[in-house]
Structure formats: C-alpha cells, structure tokens
Amino acid sequence: MKYLCLLSLFFIGSLRAQPVNTLIQQAEQLERQLKEPEAIKLYQAVLLQEPAQVAALCKLAELHTVLANTAVDKKTKKLMYETAYAFAKRAYAADSNRVESSYVMAMASGNLTDFESDNRKIVEYVRDVRYYADRAVTLQPNYGKAQYVLGKWQYEMVKLSVFKKAAVKLFYGGLPEGNLDMAIACMEKCRQLEPYMVSNYLDLGRAYKENRNPTKAIEILTRLQKLPNRNSADAIMKATGAELLATLQ
C-alpha cells in the first residue's frame, strides 16, 4: 500500500511537471483512442497548474457526461452527471464569454433533469438549458454543439411529461412550448457543422419520427449507423438508434 501511494504521488508529480499544452495534447490523443478515464486524469493535471483553464474544465464536463452515458447503474450515472455539472459551472465562472462554457452548462443542466426529484430544481434546470443554449448560439451561431443542445431543448419540451409541465407552470407560470420544426432546424444545422456527432443524429431521428416523417427518420437513423465512434458512448447511442430504426422499417 505504501508503495502504491508513493507511486501515485510520483505519477501526479510527473504530470504537474509537464507543460499545460503538452498535457492537453496527450489528453486529446487519449480521447481519440476512446480512453476517457485516462484523458480525464490529464485534464485534471492541467487544473493542478491552472485551476481556471477553461478548455480543460469544458473537456472534463464533456468527458464525465460520456462516462455517465456509458454507466450501467443509475447511481453512477447521477454522480457522473453531477460531476460534469460542477466542472461546467467552473468553466462558466472562469469565462462566461466562451461559447464552450455556455454549451457545457446547457448540456450539463439538461442531463440532470431526469435525476432530480425536487420540482423546483427540475424547472430551474429546464430554464437553464434554454438560457445557456441561447447564449451559446448568440455567442457563436455556427457552433454546432450549441445548435444541437438548443434543438434538443425544443424536442424535449414537446416530449415533456404532463407532470413536469405542471411543475413548470406552478413555479414559473410556464415556459415557451417546444417546437418540432425548430428542433429539427437546429439539429439539421448541427449536422452541417458537426457531421459526425452521433447524439445529434439520434435525437434528429427521434424528432423526425415525432414529427410524423418516418422516411426522413429512417434516412437519418441509417446514416447514424455508419458514423465512426468518437467516444465510448457513441456505440451505445448507435445501438439505440438501430432499435428505433427497426421499428420504422
């Protein structure tokens, strides 16, 4: 045990000795290899040197979301989503004018809506998704991920349960209704800007299905199956898309 502790301290010390740019490059390489836990360690090492390094904070929010999406049990999913949210908040506090900071705040807020039992908090998360998504699109209209999260918000508002809609009305007097045409428009724009974003294809296929356009849903979900896996959660999302596709054929 003592040996392992010393080895761990040596490892951390060696990481801290490396330049931030080198650590980020190594972390990005690990991401390309779908080694998210290892990449997370390097981004955390960046924060040991620069606690407000926005790029690292945003990456940590995204990578913990990937871990949540691959987790089997609900407890682990919630923990990873909460961790992602914490890093997103730090990123936004460090630089609220970075489009990536607003994007990860919208993403992380949306992830927590299904894991929150307090109605007031659910509504706050729903409102935050729209606020930060709008802010991200305003900062950079051609940031594909921002278009995706805004489109997903529109879709989710259409699909919002009666219970959650009642909570929204109770605490805030309601929110704008979701619009499937707007959801599809945003996600189609994301598809142009981020042609390999698996989650966008999956939700776009769902939106077309909900909008009673099975032909387009089949087209999108078929293309989804041909996309490369760019993170460990992509294979799971593609499998979900394949199941949905099977119901349409």
Regions inferred by a protein language model and the residue ranges of each:
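Sec-dependent N-terminal signal peptides
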Residues: 3-13
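N-terminal leader/linker segments that initiate helical-solenoid repeat arrays
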Residues: 16-69
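Short coil/linker segments at helix-helix boundaries
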Residues: 30-38, 63-97, 104-142, 152-190, ...
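Terminal, low-structured helical/coil segments at or just beyond the last alpha-helical repeat
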Residues: 163-169, 177, 194-195, 199, ...
